[in-house]
């Protein structure tokens, strides 16, 4: 029997050493071991090709190990391969300092999550992710569907549909998608919080128009296209002169007098009025585009962004100033507490808000608003009947009032009678805070609401950046753009300690007597309770009312639960249901 030659297979050990640190000495001299191979001996193209197969999360973690892997993992060639794997249809990397890395992260982190307020399931669900979408820039839920705009101007139509799950037919949200249109810049619908009013979708887009009939030459012109939200059918289109370019559109007013506000690239506001009740009729319309009074009487102002509601509009300038338009006396009284300066014959005249610092972004509800300045401070103003201002009480505010226990939010949203704040709780987690009316489950975990911002029972995605709530559902948009960062500044030391903050608009120092009076009232309520258990429950409610941070409230509630159990009360763990 002849011997069969078997080749000797040796496993060679590859040493992952940082080239900047150099190879370790004395390893080759060890007996009984093969010669190690440093990864620095591999060609850079081979190393980039190997690590491009890693998931994005692992690639980022590998880049934090040493200087060599940081440079390799940060190479555009690696991110180009990852981007083409995540979005095979994407061929143009776009613009920017790091276009391929930005595109890859946009497509890796994109996602739309929603949580229904009713029903048994109290967890986030994820909508269908369109393969053609290049990241998610903004979204808008309507009565039946959800619309999403990506970073290349494609507007997607996410439909609700009946699907079969384990042999059972179920109605699911945003589980099918189609492309509504391309070349979109912005879109808007009825600004009211109730989605039942959002019948039409107004899309600001760019289209190629022929310069002269019968010729092949064309030029880009901005236009507004109107679609039915139920079917996605286009019912109306208006085209503007090629010299006018817009970047944002919002709506204000009733259906019969719907005003479209258009923001130009130069920061000017134009408006036109349409009658929505006649849009489904096949006929031609002539509309007049006019300069809004905020740009006509204040031509030096350059508006950076705007937001609207049914009866009011808020403008934020590039210098951080805020100007208001209020069109009804009821909303004006809720926002400012008086009708002294309201002129029913001149509703477009802008009103300037007195603020201590530059405003970065804002949110506008039906009769209250929220502002965030350059130092990350949150200011609330308006009606506070349900505690939607988050000040710890239910007193209306006719001027911006700081919510002192919240800092540097990611985004802010104001609804009909409640408010939501997306906050960064730690480096690797985010939390959702809410205040106001909790009826219908709109504040998960707080069925009877809260007069101060409390942590909601919602598992927030790591890259959450925007949110919106309807009567039936909470929506959270996930996306991360490496080129966009909120430029918060550190508050000067003179404003932190030692010097009382002046009251906004009046210049008078704030009176802390309101807090002392509230504490006396709380003690009076505790004293009126007859048993220790009743006093414990009342103290839990008071903790929910007080303007404390979410972690502080959790601490006090946990401590009160421990004391209550020690006395034999056996109270349930968790926050109480405070009155609205």
Curated annotation (Swiss-Prot):
Keywords, sorted A to Z:
Ubl conjugation pathway
Which parts are the RCC repeats?
A: 376-425
Q: List the disulfide bonds.
A: none
As recorded in UniProt, coiled-coil segments are none
- In this chain the F-box domain maps to 36-82
Q: How does it assemble?
A: Directly interacts with SKP1 and CUL1.
Its function, per the record, reads: Substrate-recognition component of the SCF (SKP1-CUL1-F-box protein)-type E3 ubiquitin ligase complex.
Checking InterPro entries in the record gives: F-box-like_dom_sf, F-box_dom, F-box_protein_24, RCC1/BLIP-II, Reg_chr_condens
Cytoplasm recorded as keyword: no
Q: Does the keyword DNA-binding apply?
A: no
- The molecule here is called F-box only protein 24
Q: What organism is recorded for this protein?
A: Macaca fascicularis (Crab-eating macaque)
